[in-house]
Amino acid sequence: MTFTDLNTENKNGWFDVADDWLKKDRFIFIGWSGLLLFPCSYLALGGWLTGITFVTSWYTHGLASSFLEGCNALTAAVSTPPNSMGHSLLLLLGSEAQWDFTRWLQIGGLWPFIALHGAFGLIGFMLRQFEIAKAVQIRPYNAIAFSAPISVFVSVFLIYPLGQSGWFFAPSFGVAAIFRFILFFQGFHNWTLNPFHMMGVAGVLGAALLCAIHGATVENTIFEDGDSPNTFRAFNPLQSEETYSMVTANRFWSQIFGVAFSNKRWLHFFMVFVPVTGLRMSALGIVGLALNLRAYDFVSQEIRAAEDPEFETFYTKNILLNEGIRAWMAAQDQPHEQFIFPEEVLPRGNAL
């Protein structure tokens, strides 16, 4: 027996009204995720543009870092707070700035502002993909894939400095600043010899290779290419059916490699799996570095190189280079520690 609810009164509470308005069909979809995405993205991007244009890093790193000071698009950055600030959120209303906006900028308050709003903005974008996927009734693999770069951002900009002594050891937001951070990672963590970095490189470069191969193969096997020998003339968005042959592609790669993907689902899943796994493995490696876990150490080679001046490997050469990075970076990057290294302790050896 079926019962019918005869109470047809329209239940328009505040949530229903908000839900209808947020999900209204408009040029730019807002949705519930937009309440997180748009404000956080606006504040993060606005804070970064303000920082690289006007704000100095003289009080935090002893550097010029803005367009106003003569930097260009590659050398400008929003620098991390000084090491003395530890893990403070550096709120404008906090004890460090006390509502003094200029002081807040001087002590590096923009960096945690951008990092936190940027992280929540990225999460909002992932939730946006979930929300729209549900609305149009497709699977949420786009959102799942986008979670991989989010994991990298969170591990590098938030988890790593949380494992160290302060935000100071996170990357500053700028191109040259990121390069400096990469050199720092190599010198202090031997990052290139970390297996998680190796998996990350394999995932990202492998994904680029897969993308190039896939695009070329589809173009190779087009069989309804318009009335012209020129492929580009046939890029017609009004064509309703696909016009490439999976069978032909399978036959081609079977002859090239001896193996080939048997169906499109497995092929495209693999194209998702490779980069996502690589990025997540690299993020996991960064979490390890936050805890100061070491990369591969070939101590026997180091001992033999120390005893025998004629023995060296590419590994021992890199170890000496890492020592050089540490010695030079520590003094320049942490001026408040007042490190002074006499000439005799700087790395000298077979490799340098």
UniProtKB/Swiss-Prot annotation:
Q: Which GO terms describe its biological process?
A: photosynthetic electron transport in photosystem II
- An annotated GO cellular component: photosystem II
EC no.? 1.10.3.9
Chain positions recorded as pheophytin a binding sites:
129, 142
Q: Which Pfam family, just one, is annotated for this protein?
A: Photo_RC
Q: Which reaction does it catalyse?
A: 2 a plastoquinone + 4 hnu + 2 H2O = 2 a plastoquinol + O2
Please tell me whether the keyword tRNA-binding is annotated for this protein. no
This entry's comment on the bound cofactor is: The D1/D2 heterodimer binds P680, chlorophylls that are the primary electron donor of PSII, and subsequent electron acceptors. It shares a non-heme iron and each subunit binds pheophytin, quinone, additional chlorophylls, carotenoids and lipids. There is also a Cl(-1) ion associated with D1 and D2, which is required for oxygen evolution. The PSII complex binds additional chlorophylls, carotenoids and specific lipids.
Q: One GO molecular function term?
A: oxygen evolving activity
**Topology with regard to the membrane?**
Multi-pass membrane protein
What Gene3D superfamilies is this protein classified in?
Answer: Photosystem II protein D1-like
Where does the chain bind chlorophyll a ChlzD2? 117
What the entry lists under InterPro entries is as follows: D1/D2, Photo_II_D1/D2_sf, Photo_RC_L/M, Photo_RC_L/M_CS, PSII_PsbD/D2
Instruction: Cite the CDD domains for this sequence.
Output: Photosystem-II_D2 (cd09288)
| The entry's keywords | Chlorophyll, Chloroplast, Chromophore, Electron transport, Iron, Magnesium, Membrane, Metal-binding, Oxidoreductase, Photosynthesis, Photosystem II, Plastid, Thylakoid, Transmembrane, Transmembrane helix, Transport
Residues at which a plastoquinone binds: 214, 261
Annotated Fe cation binding lies at 214, 268
Disulfide bond among keywords:
no
Q: Where in the cell is it found?
A: Plastid, Chloroplast thylakoid membrane
Any transmembrane segments, and where?
40-60, 124-140, 152-165, 207-227, 278-294
Self-association state and partner proteins as the record states: PSII is composed of 1 copy each of membrane proteins PsbA, PsbB, PsbC, PsbD, PsbE, PsbF, PsbH, PsbI, PsbJ, PsbK, PsbL, PsbM, PsbT, PsbY, PsbZ, Psb30/Ycf12, at least 3 peripheral proteins of the oxygen-evolving complex and a large number of cofactors. It forms dimeric complexes.
Q: NCBIfam families recorded for this chain? A: psbD
Q: Which family does it belong to?
A: Belongs to the reaction center PufL/M/PsbA/D family.
The protein's role, per its UniProt record: Photosystem II (PSII) is a light-driven water:plastoquinone oxidoreductase that uses light energy to abstract electrons from H(2)O, generating O(2) and a proton gradient subsequently used for ATP formation. It consists of a core antenna complex that captures photons, and an electron transfer chain that converts photonic excitation into a charge separation. The D1/D2 (PsbA/PsbD) reaction center heterodimer binds P680, the primary electron donor of PSII as well as several subsequent electron acceptors. D2 is needed for assembly of a stable PSII complex.
Know the name of this protein?
Photosystem II D2 protein
